[in-house]
A protein has these predicted regions:
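Viral virion structural and adsorption modules
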Residues: 1-4, 138-140, 144-163
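Short, acidic/charged, Gly/Pro-enriched secondary-structure junctions
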Residues: 83-116
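Short beta-strand and beta-hairpin "edge-sheet" elements
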Residues: 104-148
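Short, surface-exposed linear patches
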Residues: 64, 94-99, 124-127, 140-143, ...
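A generic "cationic amphipathic patch" detector
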Residues: 87, 132, 151-152
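Solvent-exposed edge beta-strands and adjacent loop segments
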Residues: 2-78, 116-133
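Acidic glycine-/aspartate-rich tracts in secreted/extracellular proteins
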Residues: 79-81, 144
């Protein structure tokens, strides 16, 4: 099998514009892709780690990741009329449950990671007077994401995305 460098645009990030909030509601979701006007999507995994040193380690620690918060920083230009951007921009002054929805990421192999999410740090416009409006927000996963293999035949127990 030949090795391939995937390009970032091959990843697909979507949000539910119907505002469903649990994985039980996936079949009710109205998915909108974050693509038009979007320049960068940067995934992040903020980890909680235990680094307890034990005597048998002679004072040195081992690292155990005990928790994780997954998020996606999304930036680009505001495109009025785009379903995903319009939905997110409409939540700019929202708080609490109004910022919750469903999201899914499909990697280049077709594997899907779906999760309840919170829309954070929404910037619906901004920039110089003679420039396209900026658009950015953070999409934060709530709880452990559900991973579906590329065949779509079922949920895997692996929470990683190693292609």
């Amino acid at each position: 099998m030949a090795k391939t460098f995937n390009e970032n645009y091959q990843n697909k990030l979507e949000i539910d514009t119907a505002g469903n909030t649990t994985l039980d509601d996936l079949s009710k979701a109205t998915w909108a892709t974050l693509a038009a006007g979007i320049q960068t999507i940067t995934p992040s995994a903020s980890e909680t780690a235990d680094t307890t040193p034990y005597y048998d380690g002679e004072g040195f620690s081992s690292v155990d990741v005990t928790g994780k918060t997954i998020s996606f920083a999304v930036t680009g230009h505001r495109l009025d009329g785009d379903a995903a951007q319009d939905y997110i921009a409409s939540k700019y002054i929202g708080v609490g449950d109004t910022l919750h929805t469903l999201a899914r990421w499909t990697d280049p192999s077709g594997k899907q990671v779906q999760f309840p999410a919170t829309l954070q740090a929404i910037v619906p416009f901004g920039g110089a007077a003679n420039a396209k409006q900026t658009f950015s927000f953070t999409l934060a996963a709530n709880g452990k994401p559900q991973v579906v293999d590329a065949s779509g035949t079922g949920t895997t127990t692996d929470s990683g995305t190693g292609q």
